[in-house]
From Swiss-Prot:
Entries under Pfam families matching the protein: IGPD
PANTHER family to which the protein is assigned, alphabetical: IMIDAZOLEGLYCEROL-PHOSPHATE DEHYDRATASE, IMIDAZOLEGLYCEROL-PHOSPHATE DEHYDRATASE HIS7
UniProt catalytic activity: D-erythro-1-(imidazol-4-yl)glycerol 3-phosphate = 3-(imidazol-4-yl)-2-oxopropyl phosphate + H2O
Entry keywords, A to Z: Amino-acid biosynthesis, Cytoplasm, Histidine biosynthesis, Lyase
UniProt GO molecular function: imidazoleglycerol-phosphate dehydratase activity
Subcellular location: Cytoplasm
PROSITE patterns reported for this sequence: IGP_DEHYDRATASE_1 (PS00954), IGP_DEHYDRATASE_2 (PS00955)
The family this protein is said to belong to: Belongs to the imidazoleglycerol-phosphate dehydratase family.
The organism of origin for this protein: Mycolicibacterium vanbaalenii (strain DSM 7251 / JCM 13017 / BCRC 16820 / KCTC 9966 / NRRL B-24157 / PYR-1) (Mycobacterium vanbaalenii)
Pathway: Amino-acid biosynthesis; L-histidine biosynthesis; L-histidine from 5-phospho-alpha-D-ribose 1-diphosphate: step 6/9
A Gene Ontology term for the protein's cellular component: cytoplasm
Keyword rRNA-binding: no
Gene giving rise to this polypeptide: hisB
Protein name as annotated: Imidazoleglycerol-phosphate dehydratase
BP GO annotations: L-histidine biosynthetic process
Amino acid sequence: MSDPIRPARRAKVERKTKESDIVVELDLDGTGQVSVDTGVPFFDHMLTSLGSHASFDLTIKAVGDIEIEGHHTIEDTAIVLGQALGQALGDKKGIRRFGDAFIPMDETLAHAAVDVSGRPYFVHTGEPDYMVEFTIAGSAAPYHTVVNRHVFESLAFNARIALHVRTLYGRDPHHITEAEYKAVARALRQAVEYDPRVSGVPSTKGTL
């Protein structure tokens, strides 16, 4: 829940194109209450993990052309989620700004680092080459792991953050993907939380 002496950090963003219709509601100071429906079951699972482990309250409803392929819906959802994150951050006063996390999942270890800098940048390294061809099947629409990069890149550029995601090692594409999402979640949680020793914008320039 929001601190009574702090402004609410919430956003609702809607985006409609010929390929998708997406609504995202986000509260950065939530408790991990998440409801996601994109029509792509594995992506729903990943976004639920992201919201839960970031301790965001997150509601996502996406309707897209998944009968053709899920890529449009997945990437457009990441765009809107990034926009909501950027809006919810507001003036960024009092936040820690930086965050990072190592996340193990069985044989896999992933790492994510975040700078809420206002300067969007994205680096993605370490995934095995076969991740560009692997498909995680779903009852409604499959998830092609090649989109991992697109999801995080769209999130970073639309939230205007610097985001580095890397897989140090791993074998199972499911574990690699899930560890990356959870690492991003934990890094975001750390970066956007309030620092009790900081009252202004955490930058020597005075703005982010």
